[in-house]
Structure formats: C-alpha cells, structure tokens
Design a protein with these regions (language model features):
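Conserved P-loop NTPase motor "coupling/switch" region that bridges the ATPase
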Residues: 123, 293-305
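Structural preference for long, well-ordered alpha-helical segments in enzyme cores
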Residues: 48-56, 68-71, 75, 79-83, ...
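Helicase-core coupling region on the C-terminal RecA-like lobe
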Residues: 307-326
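Short glycine-/polar-rich loops that comprise or flank the Walker A/P-loop
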Residues: 62-65, 92-93, 269-271, 277-278, ...
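ATP-hydrolysis module of ASCE/P-loop NTPase motor domains
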Residues: 112-198, 304, 310
Length: 326
C-alpha cells in the first residue's frame, strides 16, 4: 500500500482586525499607567497585545518604541508577523522578542572597552561541565558524595548539573548562597554542586584570560542577570533604553522567572501592559515561577482587567478546568 504524499502548510495569518469585547477594548485604549490583564486560555490576551500595539502605531507612535516580550522564538515570530501584516510602517528593530533575545542585545550594547559578547550554547556548556567533572574524577572526586561517584561519568548528570546552575542563577542564587542553603537544609548534593559551581566559574574566567579572540563568552544561566547588571553599571545606557521603549507589553508573564522580572522592572515605564494566567504556567522545568506571580504583579496593578469571554474553548470545559485548578 503506497503512502499518500503530504506537505506541511504554514498557518495563514489573519490580516483583518479582531472583534474586541468591552474588556479587551478597555485594555487597548488604556494609556498612562501600568495595567495587568488576567484571563484563562482562549480569552484573547495575546490578541489584546497585538491590537494595543497596532492602535499605538496607527496613532503615530514609532513602532521601534514598542517592545513586546514573550516566551519562545516561534511565538515572537508569530507576533511580529501578526503586527507587520497590518501596518505599512517600517520597523528597524524586532517589535516582539524573548527576554533572552532582549538581554543579549543589551549586552551587545557595549560600554567603551568592553569585549564582544558570545553566548555559549547549551551543548557547549554541557561539554565544558563534563570536562570539569572528568577532572574531578581524576582528582579523587573532590567534594562529591560517594553515592554520586558513578553518576559523575554520565551525560545525564552533567545535564542536570547545568540545569541546577541555570535555575539557581535565574533566582538570584549564587554558588555561596547555594552552599549556605545546602548546609541549612542538610542537602549534601547542593553543597557539592556549589563547590563545583565555584570551580566552573573560576575556570571560565581563566578561559577568558587565555582566549585569543578577546571576546566575552556568556554562560546562558547568566544572560538575563548579566543584562541587568550591565544596565545598572551603565546608567546612560539604561536611560537610553527607557527612552527608546516607551511602551512595553509582556505576554504569558506567568512563565517568567525572577531574573526576567528584575530586567522588566529596570526597563518599564508608565505605558506597560502585562498579560498573565497563573493557572496555565507550563515552564517550571526551565525556571518559570508562577508561585511568585501575585507578588511580581503587585507593583503594576494601577489598573487590572480580567478577561472572561472564552473564544478558543467551550466555556463549560474552561470553567471545569479553572475550578479544578482552584
């Protein structure tokens, strides 16, 4: 039996304006102070951001002064396309981008004398961690507990160790703090990982010193926090970005981590729209912090709108799911 040929067809983007309900329209027309938009899946939070961006562009605002932050490169690309399809204005910068893309662009805005930044890939970082672990094995396993000795030889352990460093960094926890927490909680693995983390950071510094290309290699776990530090150390650059991005919008804020929220706090002005749904966070595995969502939203609750109309799911199904989560 012959197989039927198939092709992957990209979803056709809609160029027509969305029909907004009264709650959505209130968000789109809001100006002058931060606004928090809450709503479940299918209530049109992302639609609100697209329409709010387009409304400002149609009023004459420079598209390059609007920054729409989201999670995932594919989602950012979809948002850029949805907006570009309905405006003829030229955009010199990506209007929608991820926090990591924004952070890297900030680090590329170097102060005088700063080296060119290069972002290490995940596989590069894991490979380097494996090299250091191999050295630990040759040195008699250093601080590693005996029940982890066999694990040190595996790729999976290097991957888990990298993930621990990522998650800790996103929460503003450094190696010293991790060691302290390990001692307080009686977590011997944390203490061993903290000691390794210090060796890892020291070896990264030595690599930078011995590198021939005079470029700054950035650990992915430090990317967003380094961008915040860079802005604090360069107040003129911070003022430049705050003046450039007069409107900031954030989609899926529940997927953010503490480092990303800190960067947003530095950049945000008065024209700020944040969309969130605490019930649908799916990124805990990569550092999302939905448990801290309410506290993170508090500084921006000058006005709050809850979207109640569901356009993508049956209302009964949505209600059952929401009640179950509650």
């Amino acid at each position: 039996m012959s197989k039927q040929p198939f092709s992957l067809v990209r979803q056709v983007l809609k160029a027509a304006p969305a029909a907004l309900d009264s709650e959505q329209a209130a968000v789109v027309s809001h100006r002058g102070s931060p606004i928090v938009v809450q709503g479940g899946p299918g209530t049109g939070k992302t639609t609100v951001l697209v329409e709010a961006a387009l409304a400002r562009i149609q009023e004459g605002q420079n598209p390059d002064s609007i920054l729409l932050l989201t999670y995932g490169r594919e989602r950012a690309s979809e948002l850029r396309d949805a907006i570009a399809l309905r405006t003829t204005k030229t955009m010199f910068e990506p209007l929608a981008r991820t926090f990591h893309s924004l952070a890297f662009s900030i680090l590329k805005m170097k102060a005088k004398g700063d080296p060119e930044p290069i972002l290490l890939s995940g596989p590069e970082q894991e490979s380097y961690i494996r090299e250091l672990l191999h050295g630990d094995i040759e040195d008699g396993f250093k601080e590693w507990p005996e029940d982890l000795h066999k694990a040190l030889t595996t790729n999976g352990f290097a991957r888990e160790l990298r993930d621990l460093i990522l998650r800790a960094s996103e929460r503003g926890i450094d190696a010293d703090e991790l060691a302290k927490l390990g001692a307080q909680e009686g977590e011997k693995y944390w203490q061993a990982a903290a000691a390794f983390w210090k060796r890892y950071l020291n070896s990264m510094v030595m690599r930078e010193i011995s590198a021939q290309d005079a470029k700054l290699r950035i650990d992915p776990s430090e990317l967003v926090s380094r961008a915040s530090i860079h802005l604090r150390n360069n107040p003129d650059l911070l003022d430049q970005l705050r003046n450039r991005f007069t409107t900031i919008m954030v989609d899926e804020f529940q997927e953010s981590d503490p480092a990303q929220r800190e960067l947003l706090t530095l950049l945000a002005g008065s024209d700020l729209i944040i969309c969130a749904d605490a019930d649908s966070a799916v990124g805990r595995f990569r550092g999302a912090d939905p448990d801290g969502l309410a506290a993170a939203l508090d500084p921006y609750r000058a006005q709050e709108v809850v979207l109640t109309n569901v356009y993508r799911s049956a209302k009964a199904v949505f209600a059952v799911g929401h009640d179950y989560v509650q």
